[in-house]
Structure formats: structure tokens, C-alpha cells
């Protein structure tokens, strides 16, 4: 028979990813104890054999057990364990909520030296949000990728920047996923921060090697970021002002506990930097923002749905103006004044916009399904203006040049993932994905104007192919078979 269900946080109602479910099969053994009075009493002792599993990315677990009495122990980091004793006489659905525990007790940690190499995911590291929140970083801004830099096999490159280099690979050779959707150029402030807002993150898993087949493979690593579903018990939130940015987070139930929302926003404040920039006379200006929004709904014990949105963008501006005047003498030795003005403006921006819809369904106690539709638009653009002016009593000469550069990637995809658990030590994952890629590699337009004769030269630089979108189709199927043998 099979027992399945969800493991959640008792306070917030959030599903817990990677929660442990340990099974103790009870076998009754009769023994005889001789009391100090000399009389013999019969006692029943329980001899247990432990096995177990853990919850998936949606907090779901499934265990197939033989008929009889069993004890299920549910545990999660930072939560008090809970034990349920059940009788396996039919298939059961058992949802459990764990309460956070602030009590610190003495503990003995025992581990096997070969535990890592015996795992099918020996290159995987799970990073909970609590670790991200407690990691000291430069300028006080908590960051997901800077926390990963402290993990074995991961390096950070330049000190203080958020790029990760896994086992000798490059910073651009990592697959970055936000709730299953690929992101591009995941950096703010030219690499000082990542686009992942810590308040919106539930859990991060990084695969440094032996990538699971469902990700399709990458050169260096896979970073899978999962966001919060929202507090189903009450409205809660926070407002934070840091050295670089302000952050806002709000979550709670919309109508009842079955529908929740989570909203996080982060933006770089410029009031401090504007004063420093103006005081230093610098022509630079910079800003960025992130917005994460998610609505979750529980249709039934077997069916749940999510709609998620992310938008993040960086803006860089350079503006330089200069003006000078000089006195000259003409051929007739008459003096005249030449006024020269120069203006240079440069605007650079880039960012991702993601929209996704997800539905999960439990077909039976052994088969869990996840269906996702998503789209991501990444855009990068440069707008520059150069203007020169020369004016005197002899006449006026003006030159103006405007240049626009843009490129982008549009991904639209459908994905289906299934988890099938035929037995406690056997998990089969299978599914497929279709992605439609739209590439705009490079479009450059230039306009040059000479004021003297009012001529305008329009130049669409590069070939005609640059103005067209190049499309590509990607389809994949995968099967993962994870079997854990009994340790002798």
C-alpha cells in the first residue's frame, strides 16, 4: 500500500522542500523480565527497521509500504519533528504540518564517509533560505549567488561580485532557473548583485556535476531557485532599507487558506548616490529593480495551481556636456568669437520578464504530475546621442548622430514532469519539454544630420538578416531511474 501527501510549515502553510519522511516498521517481540521481587513479567518490545524518503520541489512525498503498523517521522531543518503511527491496510493520503522550533538541544551528528559517492546526485547542494539570510556579505545586501560561492567546488571570481565559477567553468556557463524558467544575464550593477531577491526565495539547489536528465545538461552547473508560495495563515511582510536598495515583501491569504499570494519588490535608491555623483562631478547614473509576484491556489488535496511573474531591469546612463569659447582673428584682422559645444549621451539597459503558469496533480498515490507553461523575454538595448555645435559671427555648423542598438531572446515553452514511485527505494522521473526560441542577435540603426544643409543620412547597419527574428525549436524527452539499494 502507498501513503502520500504534502509536508507544510504549520505557521505559514508553505510547502517544505526536502523534508525527511522516515519509516519505522514495527515488529512485536515478546520477552520476559524478572523484577527485583523475583516475579517474572511479560513485556512487549518493538524492534524497528528504518527507511524513508524526502519531499520533492512541491513538498510532496510518496511511500509504498507493506501491510502492517508503521511509524512515520517527519522532520525538517528548523522545525520540530512529528511522528504519526498508522496502519497500512489501504492507500492513504496524509498531510502533515511541522511547527518551527527555536529550542537548541545537544545533538550527535553521525555520517558515513561514502554517503556522498553512493548518492546519484553526489554533486548537488541544497541551500535553504535561512542560510542565505545569515550569510555575511559586502555592503550588507544578502545574495543567493554570493552564498553559493562559499560552497565546495564553487568560486566567486572577483571579490564582492556575484558571478559563480563551478569547477573551472565560466560565469556564463551555468543554467539559472527561476521556478523552472531559464533566466539570462542574472546580474545587477554589472555583477555586484544577482537578480534573485532573498525574501522571495524558498530554496536553492545547485548541481555541480552529474546533472539530472530533466535539466538537459550544462557545461558548469545548474542553479534551481524555487520561490515562496505565500503565507496561508495570515498577512505578513517586511520593509528593508539597505546601503544599496530598498526591499518590500508582502504575503498572505487572498480569500481563504486555499488561495495565497507572495509579492516582493526591490529597487536601488539613488538619493545617496546622486549627491555623491553630483559632488564628484561625475556624469554617471544607475538604477535597477526586481519584482516577484506569485498567486497559488489549492483546488483539492490532489490538485494545485500557480501563476508567477518576474520582472527585473538595469538602467545605466552617461551624460556629458561641455561648452567653450575662443577668440580668433579673421583674414581682415577683425576679431570674432567661436563657441563650441559638445554633448554625449549613452543609455544602456537590460533585463528579464518572466510569466509562468503551473498545475500539479496527484493521479494516484504513486504518480505525481507537474505541468508548466512559461515565457521569458530578455532584452538589451543601447541608445547613444552625439552632438557637436560650432557657432560664430561667420556662421554655424552643427552635427548630430543618433545610434540605437538592441538584441533580445524570447522563449516560450511547455513542460510536463512526472514522479512515479513504485516502491520506497525506487523513484522514476520522466517527462518532456518543448521550447520555441526567438533570437534577435543584433539590430543597429544610425541617423546622422548636418544642420547646414539639413541633410539626414539614415543607416540601418549590418545586413537585412539583422532586422529579422531567428527562430528555433527545441524538444526533449527524459527518463531518470533512481534506485537505492539496501546497505548491508
Which ranges hold each PLM region?
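A short, amphipathic beta-strand motif
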Residues: 3-9, 59, 96, 107
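Short, acidic Ser/Thr/Gly-rich low-complexity loop/linker segments typical of extracellular
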Residues: 27-60
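A short, solvent-exposed loop/turn motif at the edges and junctions
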Residues: 28, 70-84, 114
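Periplasmic N-terminal accessory/gating domains of Gram-negative outer-membrane beta-barrel systems
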Residues: 56-58, 78-80, 92, 110-211, ...
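A beta-strand signature from Gram-negative outer-membrane beta-barrel systems
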Residues: 94-96, 150-151, 195-238, 247-251, ...
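Transmembrane beta-strands of outer-membrane beta-barrel pores
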Residues: 227, 243-245, 254-256, 267-271, ...
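Periplasmic-side early beta-strands and strand-to-turn transitions of outer-membrane beta-barrels
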Residues: 232-233, 255-350, 380, 384
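Face-selective signature of the C-terminal outer-membrane beta-barrel domain
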Residues: 296-314, 346-488
Amino acid at each position: 500500500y502507498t501513503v502520500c501527501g504534502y509536508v507544510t510549515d504549520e505557521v505559514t502553510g508553505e510547502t517544505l522542500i526536502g523534508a525527511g519522511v522516515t519509516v519505522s516498521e514495527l515488529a512485536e517481540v515478546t520477552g520476559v523480565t524478572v523484577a527485583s521481587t523475583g516475579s517474572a513479567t511479560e513485556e512487549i518490545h518493538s524492534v524497528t527497521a528504518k527507511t524513508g524518503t524526502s519531499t520533492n520541489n512541491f513538498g510532496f512525498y510518496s511511500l509504498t509500504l507493506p501491510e502492517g503498523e508503521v511509524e512515520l517521522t517527519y522532520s525538517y531543518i528548523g522545525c520540530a519533528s512529528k511522528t504519526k503511527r498508522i496502519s497500512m491496510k489501504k492507500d492513504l493520503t496524509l498531510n502533515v504540518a511541522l511547527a518551527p522550533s527555536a529550542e537548541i538541544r545537544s545533538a550527535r551528528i553521525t555520517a558515513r564517509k561514502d554517503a556522498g559517492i553512493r548518492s546519484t546526485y553526489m554533486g548537488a547542494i541544497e541551500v535553504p533560505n535561512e542560510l542565505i539570510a545569515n550569510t555575511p556579505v559586502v555592503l550588507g545586501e544578502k545574495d543567493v549567488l554570493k552564498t553559493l560561492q562559499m560552497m565546495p567546488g564553487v568560486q566567486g571570481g572577483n571579490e564582492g561580485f556575484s558571478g559563480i565559477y563551478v569547477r573551472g567553468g565560466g560565469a556564463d556557463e551555468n543554467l539559472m532557473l527561476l521556478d523552472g524558467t531559464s533566466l539570462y544575464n542574472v546580474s545587477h550593477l554589472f555583477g555586484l548583485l544577482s537578480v534573485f531577491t532573498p525574501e522571495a526565495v524558498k530554496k536553492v539547489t545547485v548541481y555541480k556535476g552529474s546533472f539530472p536528465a530533466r535539466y538537459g545538461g550544462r557545461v558548469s552547473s545548474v542553479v534551481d531557485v524555487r520561490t515562496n508560495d505565500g503565507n496561508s495563515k495570515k498577512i505578513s511582510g517586511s520593509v528593508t532599507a539597505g546601503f544599496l536598495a530598498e526591499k518590500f515583501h508582502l504575503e498572505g491569504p487572498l480569500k481563504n487558506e486555499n488561495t495565497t499570494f507572495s509579492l516582493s519588490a526591490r529597487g536601488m535608491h539613488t538619493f545617496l548616490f546622486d549627491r555623491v555623483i553630483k559632488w564628484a562631478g561625475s556624469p554617471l547614473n544607475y538604477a535597477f529593480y526586481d519584482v516577484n509576484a506569485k498567486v497559488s491556489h489549492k483546488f483539492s488535496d490532489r490538485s494545485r495551481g500557480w501563476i508567477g511573474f518576474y520582472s527585473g531591469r538595469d538602467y545605466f546612463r552617461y551624460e556629458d556636456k561641455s561648452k567653450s569659447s575662443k577668440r580668433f582673428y579673421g583674414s581682415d584682422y577683425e576679431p570674432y568669437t567661436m563657441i563650441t559645444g559638445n554633448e554625449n549621451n549613452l543609455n544602456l539597459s537590460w533585463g528579464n520578464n518572466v510569466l509562468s503558469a503551473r498545475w500539479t496533480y496527484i493521479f494516484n498515490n504513486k504518480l505525481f504530475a507537474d505541468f508548466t507553461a512559461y515565457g521569458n523575454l530578455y532584452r538589451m538595448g543601447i541608445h547613444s546621442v552625439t552632438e557637436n555645435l560650432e557657432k560664430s559671427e561667420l556662421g554655424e555648423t552643427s552635427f548630430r548622430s543618433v545610434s540605437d542598438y538592441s538584441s533580445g531572446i524570447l522563449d516560450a515553452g511547455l513542460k510536463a514532469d512526472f514522479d512515479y514511485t513504485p516502491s520506497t527505494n525506487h523513484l522514476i522521473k520522466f517527462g518532456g519539454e518543448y521550447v520555441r526560441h526567438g533570437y534577435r542577435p543584433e539590430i543597429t540603426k544610425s541617423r546622422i544630420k548636418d544642420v547646414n544643409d539639413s541633410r539626414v543620412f539614415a543607416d540601418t547597419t549590418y545586413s537585412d538578416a539583422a532586422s529579422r527574428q531567428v527562430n528555433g525549436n527545441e524538444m526533449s524527452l527524459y527518463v531518470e531511474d533512481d534506485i537505492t539499494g539496501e546497505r548491508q
